[in-house]
Amino acid sequence: MAPLLELKNVSKAFGGLQVISNLDLHVNEHEIVSVIGPNGAGKTTLFNLVTGVYTPEEGDILFEGESIVGLPPNKITRRGIARTFQTLRLFLNMTVKENVMAAAYGHTRAGIVRSVLRTRGMRREEREISALAEEKLAFFGQRLAGYRHDQQAYSLSYANRRRLEIARAMATNARLLLLDEPAAGMNPHETHEITELIGKLRDEAGYSILVIEHDMHVVEGISDRVIALDHGLKIAEGSFDEVATHPLVVEAYLGVRAEAEEAV
C-alpha cells in the first residue's frame, strides 16, 4: 500500500540558504512519525511545504498518491491535511464550540448569498456543523465537554487551549494531522496527558500523524518512527532508540565532534 503522505527528493532554499535538501519522507496510514532536530534544522519549513505555504524548488509531495505541490493551503486542507501551530491560533473571544465550528466551515457548500439570506440549506449545514463540533469536542472528555462548549477560549488553561487547537484540526475532516510542538509550554502532568492523547488520536480516531516535538519523553512515548533533521538534511531514521543514539544525532544536539576537536 502506498504511503498516505510521501515527500520525494524535496528541496527548498531561501536565497543562498538551503533549508531542506533532497528530503525523502513518508507517513503511512495510522502511523505516528516524529520529526526532531535542533533549532534551524528545517522542521517548520517541512510543515510549511506539506501545507502549501511554501513550494519546493525540487521534488514532489504526494498525498494519497496525488501531487499536492502548487495547491494553496485551503485546498490542501480540503484534501485532508490539517495543522496545529506552536504558537496557538485560536479565536480567543469566541466560545470553544464556535472555534471548532469555524474550522469546519471550510467544508460547507453555502456561499455568501445563502449565508446572508439564511436559506434552509444554510441552516441545515449549521446544524450539521454544530453536531460535528460537539462530536470532536467529546473526544477530549471533560476537558472540553459540557459547560466548556460555551466558555470563551481565552478562559481556558494553556493545556486546554492546546486541546482546542487539535479539535479544530479534527473538524476539518482531516486524515493526516501535523502537530507542531503539541507539548510546548506544558508541565510534566500535562505533557503526560498530551502524550496519551496523541496515541489516542491514532488508535481510536484513526488519524495518521506527523509531529514536530522537542520533548524527547513525548517523542519516545508516541512514535512509530522518528526522523532527525539537521540543516535541512535527514541524518537518521528509525525507532526512537536507534535515532536517539545515532552518532550524527548526538553530534547535532551536543556538538560532540566540535568539542572533541577543541580538546585536541
Regions found by a protein language model. Name each.
Residues 2-264:
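Glycine-rich phosphate-binding loops of nucleotide-dependent enzymes
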